């Protein structure tokens, strides 16, 4: 009998915090399913969702402002445990008669949280010798305690940093347990969802695969599915998962646009067609893409040209597959959240999301998105469980337009060939030196400028390659990776000696912000 992995679930109500997705990821790491919804989710919808616990996120507003975001008051009478984080704690405090005012001294950054009184069940294992380092980000604080609550923790600047009413299973923390800067934060969230809410931890890779396979079979029946395979993590895992469910009913279309990494097309075919037995149609479209991109230097126009041509080619190939009624995409949960935010206007939208996107409506294909409940780290775990090569599953992000936006300015075959060889050397050396898995994203960039050099007794006038490597948790902010000088020297030497047309290599030490991770 299969496990229903959605019976135990946590509801996270979002008040606009930049960290809300991290809350969801921490809950998932405790092997418990959760969903993010806007703060004004109606009470009937919440009852229908039937959460085993509710988490109120932080947010940029002040609870005492006119029109400040709030929940329906009856939410606290549902009889399920509630954890308020930052703004969520202040909202809960105000609801139960407490007072929230601007702090005399705001707290942003690291702070030492000190136990006050007897910590309740939420704080088991959280304090060590009566204290715990935490991450603060607030300008308001609770000045008068809500009725029925006890103070559990304080800092040197704020006397009320954690509160509890164990009789009603209501808890609040002023700090952010979801961020990595709160070292034992995952313990607190795990305790809340497992011990206080009573979840048993059914959200595991094996159970997720079993559930997805059953749902795909129920949705698709005996109909045929097509999927645009890019070689990226999301589409690769989606392909492996769907193939496990319906076998030869899946056909993948792999468009080789000539802007992939070195030997990437052959690797994709070897992994899927040869090893996993997936039916893959490979389309060699390099010349069509290069022709379409000729003389175009604007990054956004290049993206549109590449995206539109992909759709055109995908449509051509799909029309040849008889009986296909489903289009599969590697949409993941952050894509769903961003799209929902863009539609409702209740979340700050950083970018518009397009997957296979923009397929003509007249194709009349039904949409199959087996990964839409999963975060990227969960997708990777599923990929490993499905038997995909670790190097494919944990590969760094690669932009949809490929090398088209890592070649600055106009795209030419000569430039793409130089860049993919330089990039391959760079990545190979990062693996060899043990850096690759410590870096969030690393890649080479082709600069369409020439510099003077000397090789042997002769003068050279050749191109420049820039190397980029960053560390980040969320890709919203990023710091440059401190690659040791000896490794920089070895990588630079290999690229200049082995890649014809390059005589200079530079290393990008810009953080995000102000720079972006990609150059275009």
From Swiss-Prot:
GO terms for molecular function: ATP binding; GMP synthase activity. Residues 9-202 form the Glutamine amidotransferase type-1 domain. Residues 203-395 form the GMPS ATP-PPase domain. Pathway: Purine metabolism; GMP biosynthesis; GMP from XMP (L-Gln route): step 1/1. It is an enzyme of class 6 (ligase). InterPro entries: Class_I_gatase-like, GATASE, GMP_synth_C, GMP_synth_GATase, GMP_synthase, GMPS_ATP_PPase_dom, NAD/GMP_synthase, Rossmann-like_a/b/a_fold. Keywords: ATP-binding, Glutamine amidotransferase, GMP biosynthesis, Ligase, Nucleotide-binding, Purine biosynthesis. The keyword ATP-binding applies. SUPFAM superfamilies: Adenine nucleotide alpha hydrolases-like, Class I glutamine amidotransferase-like, GMP synthetase C-terminal dimerisation domain. ATP binds at residues 230-236. Catalyzes the synthesis of GMP from XMP. Homodimer. This is GMP synthase [glutamine-hydrolyzing].
């Amino acid at each position: 009998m299969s496990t229903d992995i959605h019976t135990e679930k946590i509801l996270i109500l979002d008040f606009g915090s930049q960290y809300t997705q991290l809350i969801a990821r921490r809950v998932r790491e405790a092997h418990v399913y959760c969903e993010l919804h806007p703060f004004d989710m109606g009470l009937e919808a919440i009852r229908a969702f039937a959460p085993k616990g509710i988490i109120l996120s932080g947010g940029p507003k002040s609870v005492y402002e006119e029109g400040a975001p709030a929940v329906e008051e009856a939410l606290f009478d549902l009889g399920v445990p509630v954890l308020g984080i930052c703004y969520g704690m202040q909202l809960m405090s105000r609801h139960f008669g407490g007072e929230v005012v601007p702090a005399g001294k705001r707290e942003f950054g690291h702070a030492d949280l000190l136990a006050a009184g007897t910590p309740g069940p939420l704080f088991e294992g959280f304090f060590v010798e009566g204290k715990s380092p935490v991450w603060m980000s607030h300008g308001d604080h609770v000045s008068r305690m809500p009725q029925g609550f006890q103070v559990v923790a304080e800092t040197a600047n704020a006397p009320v940093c954690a509160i509890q009413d164990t009789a009603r299973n209501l808890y609040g923390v002023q700090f952010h347990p979801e961020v990595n800067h709160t070292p034992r934060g995952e313990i607190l969230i795990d305790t809340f969802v497992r011990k206080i809410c009573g979840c048993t931890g059914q959200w595991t890779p094996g159970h997720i695969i079993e559930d997805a396979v059953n749902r795909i079979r129920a949705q698709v029946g005996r109909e045929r599915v097509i999927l645009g395979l890019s070689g990226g993590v999301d589409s690769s895992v989606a392909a492996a998962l769907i193939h496990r469910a319906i076998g030869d009913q899946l056909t993948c279309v792999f468009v080789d646009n000539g802007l992939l990494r070195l030997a990437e097309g052959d690797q994709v075919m070897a992994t899927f067609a040869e090893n996993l037995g997936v039916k893959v149609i490979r389309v060699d479209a390099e010349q069509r893409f290069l022709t379409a991109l000729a003389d175009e230097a604007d990054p956004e126009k290049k993206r549109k040209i590449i995206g539109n041509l992909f759709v055109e080619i995908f449509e051509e190939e799909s029309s040849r597959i008889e009986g296909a009624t489903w289009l599969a995409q590697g949409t993941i949960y952050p894509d769903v959240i961003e799209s929902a935010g863009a539609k409702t206007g209740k979340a700050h939208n950083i970018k518009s999301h397009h997957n296979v996107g923009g397929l003509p409506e007249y194709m009349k294909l039904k949409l199959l998105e087996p990964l839409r409940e999963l975060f990227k780290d969960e997708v990777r775990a599923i990929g490993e469980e499905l038997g995909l090569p670790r190097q494919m599953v944990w590969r760094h992000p690669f932009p949809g337009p490929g090398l088209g936006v890592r070649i600055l300015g106009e795209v030419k075959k000569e430039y793409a060939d130089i860049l993919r060889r330089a990039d391959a050397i760079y990545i190979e050396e990062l693996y060899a030196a043990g850096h690759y898995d410590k870096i969030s994203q690393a890649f080479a960039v082709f600069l369409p400028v020439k510099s003077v050099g000397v090789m042997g007794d002769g003068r050279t006038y050749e191109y420049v390659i820039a190397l980029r490597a960053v560390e980040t948790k969320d890709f919203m902010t990023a710091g440059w990776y401190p690659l040791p000088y000896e490794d920089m020297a070895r990588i630079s030497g290999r690229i200049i000696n082995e890649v014809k047309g390059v005589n200079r290599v530079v290393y990008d030490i810009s953080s995000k912000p102000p720079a972006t991770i990609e150059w275009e």
